[in-house]
Design a protein with these regions (language model features):
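Conserved catalytic scaffold of divalent metal-dependent phosphoesterases
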Residues: 88-179
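Short, conserved loop/helix-junction motifs that constitute active-site signature segments
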Residues: 73-76, 146-150, 178-183, 259-261
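Conserved beta-sheet core of the metallophosphoesterase superfamily
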Residues: 167-233
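Divalent metal-coordination and catalytic microenvironments
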Residues: 8, 44, 49, 65, ...
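Core catalytic region of metal-dependent phosphoesterases/phosphodiesterases
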Residues: 9, 13-120, 180-184
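Extreme N-terminal starter segment of soluble prokaryotic enzymes
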Residues: 1-4
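Accessory, non-catalytic peripheral segments of nucleic-acid enzymes
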Residues: 226-358
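Active-site environment of divalent metal-dependent phosphoester hydrolases
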Residues: 10-14, 52-55, 82-93, 122, ...
Length: 358
């Protein structure tokens, strides 16, 4: 039996951006649903975070979600199982008030998706799988008990485990220890958007790009085989972020093909700019010959030297969070620096979801 796996779909991402909504459905319309139909896959497990914002979703995004995603699952007669993720819940201490129960309904009112607010063992073609939703203060004891006693070799959930990559160069240092799932042959999880697989725990990664931290990180969905207990990765060919390094020392940008930059968020990194007129002509082409969602030009790094961060820290840092964490470590203050780092990280992630102009 083949089971399609989705996770961290985050419908309504980037403040209900229409740009990202259209980009998401390119994947569903051209990759996901056609693959399920061609391969006669009739079961879907969603491993949490089906929507993006915990408090609300706008009418247009909700309309598209119902008619272009949920109704299509029903029309294709896909047996759908949805785990509650942390972005799906209104309160942080319970899964009971969630977007899934409100939005994920079937047109006939009968063949509703299976929704998991609490852990449950479900049999798929003779294979028992423990379905583990987001663990919160209300269900924690029950979840941990099920992780220790459930009659299942495979676990699928929405876990916050330490030691795994949340995004590029950012490793989770908090959360539950991996040992809580050590008794399972394999654990598949949503929550972190970058693929992580240590051989026993597999964070599947998101299906598409949502922030610049997803850039150059292969996206797609997975198909689980209950007989072999292996997963197959189906690539999503669509991207929305693209970088262009400008160096006119040995390249003529008047002849540069900009087709691949259409309908993209672009970072234009200026390495060497000797011909200012050619650079301006390139900008003119990017703005007028194609449709660019956003163009950021990066060419002045002088402001970095004016910070209080030492040169060795700045040179050794791989990303924004690493830079900030190293800076916090150098602060001569009597504070809980680990707690401060967590607060900064949460603010950084929230800032990445700032509104995108449609």
């Amino acid at each position: 039996m083949k089971i399609a796996l989705l996770n961290d779909t985050h419908f309504g991402a980037r403040n209900d951006s229409n740009i990202f909504d259209e980009y998401f459905y390119k994947f569903y319309d051209n990759v996901f649903f056609p693959y399920l139909k061609e391969n006669n896959i009739k079961t879907l497990i969603h491993l949490g975070d089906i929507v993006d914002r915990r408090k609300f979703i706008n009418y247009k995004i909700a309309h598209n979600f119902k008619h272009k995603f949920m109704d299509r699952l029903w029309q294709e007669k896909i047996d759908t199982h949805i785990l509650i993720g942390n972005h799906d819940i209104y309160y942080r201490n319970t899964n009971k008030v969630n977007a899934v129960k409100s939005l994920c309904t079937a047109p006939d009112g009968e063949n509703e998706p299976f929704i998991y607010e609490d852990p449950k063992v479900v049999e798929f073609d003779g294979l028992n799988i423990l379905m583990m939703p987001w663990i919160n203060p209300e269900n924690e004891s029950h979840c941990l008990e099920m992780l220790n006693t459930a009659n299942a070799d495979v676990c699928m959930g929405h876990f916050d485990l330490n030691g795994f990559r949340m995004m590029d160069a950012m490793v989770q240092k908090h959360g539950y220890d991996k040992s809580i799932v050590s008794r399972f042959e394999k654990t598949y999880s949503g929550h972190f958007h970058h693929k992580n697989d240590d051989g026993q725990v597999f964070y599947l990664g998101s299906q598409y790009e949502m922030t610049w931290s997803d850039y150059n990180n292969q996206k797609g969905f997975h198909v689980f085989d209950t007989e072999t207990r292996e997963v197959e990765f189906i690539k999503n060919p669509y991207t929305i972020f693209k970088k262009l390094v400008y160096d006119d020392t040995d390249k003529n940008y008047d002849k540069f093909d900009i087709t691949d930059y259409n309908q993209k968020f672009i970072k234009l990194v200026v390495a060497n700019k000797r011909d200012h007129q050619m650079f301006d002509r390139l900008l003119d082409r990017l703005y007028n010959e194609i449709s660019v969602h956003e163009l950021k030009i990066i060419e002045d790094y002088s402001d970095l030297s004016h910070t209080n961060v030492s040169d060795d820290v700045a040179e050794g840092s791989e990303d924004t969070i690493t830079l900030v964490n190293d800076y916090v470590d150098q602060l001569p203050v009597d504070l809980d620096k680990d707690k401060l780092k967590i607060m900064i990280k949460e603010m950084y992630i929230e800032a990445q979801d700032t509104e995108v102009k449609d």
